Amino acid sequence: GFVELSPVLWKKIKPALSAGRVQSVAVRLIVEREKEIKNFKAEEYYRVVALLHTDNAAQPIRAELNKRLPSKEAAMEFLESCKNATFSISDLTVKPLKKSPAAPFTTSTLQQEASRKLGFTVSQTMMVAQRLYESGHITYMRTDSVNLSSLALGTIKEEIATTLGDKYYKARNYHTTAKGAQEAHEAIRPTYISHHEISGTAQEKRLYDLIWKRTIATQMADAELEKTTAEISIGGRQEKFVATGEGIKFDGFLHVYMESTDDESNDAESDTRLPELKKGETLALDEIDATQRYTQQPPRYSEAQ
């Protein structure tokens, strides 16, 4: 463990050298992840997806089986059993959801988001940000503060009210929790909020656009969503199909900006909207498909993490 590492180093080398706590933890995590990758054996499985429809809906419902099937034989047997099965809505839940915008950019969150959204490396992000800063387009790009100046907050409020209307505005104060954070600096934001676009290289324009949208979104209203989950029973079988959909009642900050995540695999499914459904309603099967997949080895830690 990292706790014992420092004294050993200290004894063997010289009193001035210490393995930094954060560094030791990072090294241990990387070593453990490498072991996991080395010992990993990919396992085959089958993922089953069905398209079904109700009598009165033109749009099909995409539903996924709630378990993975371990082999081709199991998948074939399951598909065969679905040919003449009856499908019905066994459970239906509708939950209201609220999403709030993320805080303004710090150096590390800008690096992570530029990596995910724009495919930039850490050094590329910093190089482009440096040019934007030197051209007077953004505030200083090395900061761990999420604060915005009162001047910036006033301008953002004006911008939202003018372009989108008052219902999209919500005043928010963000506070830096990191110990020893440089509170003297602001978060990374456009120098002039009224400048929606800038002249410059394609990379500079893209990074500026990301910073501008994120900054505006920080002072916007929550997005109000509705998440519907439908469980579909398969006559005579224990397995169930599950269909999920998210409906946007009020887009709020999503009108301007959606934060990325490292796992984007669920995005396509979560964006689908389900037709009006009722518990007990029967469905007709349009299409069913079993896809061979393999379990994925754990990813290595990326530079931005």
Model regions and ranges:
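Phosphate-backbone binding and catalysis cores of DNA-processing enzymes
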Residues: 1-96, 186-251
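N-terminal low-complexity, intrinsically disordered patches enriched in charged
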Residues: 67, 71-73, 254-256, 261, ...
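Generic alpha-helical secondary structure signal
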Residues: 14, 44, 49-50, 109, ...
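Structured DNA-binding interfaces in DNA transaction proteins
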Residues: 76-209, 218-219, 227, 263-305
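Polybasic, glycine- and aromatic-enriched phosphate-binding surface used to engage nucleic acids
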Residues: 239-271, 277-279
